[in-house]
UniProtKB/Swiss-Prot annotation:
This is 5-methylthioribulose-1-phosphate/5-deoxyribulose-1-phosphate aldolase. It comes from Rhodospirillum rubrum (strain ATCC 11170 / ATH 1.1.1 / DSM 467 / LMG 4362 / NCIMB 8255 / S1). Its cofactor is Co(2+). Keywords: Amino-acid biosynthesis, Cobalt, Lyase, Metal-binding, Methionine biosynthesis. It catalyses: 5-(methylsulfanyl)-D-ribulose 1-phosphate = 2-(methylsulfanyl)acetaldehyde + dihydroxyacetone phosphate; 5-deoxy-D-ribulose 1-phosphate = dihydroxyacetone phosphate + acetaldehyde.
Length: 221
């Protein structure tokens, strides 16, 4: 099979199922990719994670071309473009996680209400402007929101999280969703106080060596 790399295919399937188990995606929503040589492997369009088999995973080359029995996820463009533009990124996770999506639909970026926002690479988690799913325009908006960041929200859509590995990208997606829920709950009472920029700079510096051996959270019982 073109672009085989069977271990990466199995790893991507396991990751897609884990994202569903963690409640970050439901049904056929969301998609994941991992860097593979001169291209990427990505989950296909229209299949639930539980039904995925290695041959369903799609290889896309550096030119954005693919072949095989399955079409890639409709969001393959921003996966391809993020991996092409960001050598620090080895995997991309896109979810429609509930609280992240609520904030994205409200046009609410996540500010530095909590120091853990720095896990996403800066002093906020931005929102990429809305564009129709699967378009080059959406990819451009995602890249802009991801500049200097490891994660972002997508207006009226969902969330993107990245990492050097699938494990790291999923861990960050879990963290972003947790922050989104905490921020939403704060907003039910009042606007939370925002940490100053100099404090977030200190946190960002400390995070350069934080969590290297952190374990992925277990799924809820």
């Amino acid at each position: 099979m073109p672009g085989s790399r069977i271990a990466l295919r199995h790893g991507l399937i396991d990751a897609a199922r884990q994202v569903t188990t963690l409640g970050l995606n439901k049904g056929t929503a969301g998609n994941l990719s991992v860097r593979a040589g001169d291209g990427l492997l990505i989950t296909p369009s229209g299949l639930q994670a539980a039904d995925l088999r290695p041959n369903d995973i799609v290889f896309i080359d550096s030119e954005g071309e693919w072949r095989g029995p399955r079409k890639p996820s409709s969001e393959w463009r921003f996966h391809h473009d993020i991996l092409a533009e960001r050598p620090d990124v080895g995997a991309v996770v896109h979810t429609h996680a509930p609280f992240s999506t609520v904030l994205a639909c409200l046009g609410r970026p996540i500010p530095a209400f909590h120091y853990m926002v720095a896990m996403a690479g800066g002093n906020d988690i931005r929102i990429g402007a809305y564009a129709t799913f699967g378009t080059a325009e959406l990819s451009r908006h995602a890249l802009a929101a991801m500049e200097g960041r490891k994660a972002c929200l997508l207006a009226h859509h969902g969330m993107i999280a990245t990492g050097r590995t699938l494990k790291a990208a999923i861990k960050l997606a879990v963290e972003v969703e947790e922050l989104a829920e905490q921020y939403w709950r704060c907003l039910q009472i009042a606007e939370p106080e925002i940490l100053p920029a100099d404090e977030m700079e200190r946190v960002l510096e400390k995070f350069k060596t934080y969590g290297d051996n952190a374990q992925l959270p277990s799924p809820p019982a």
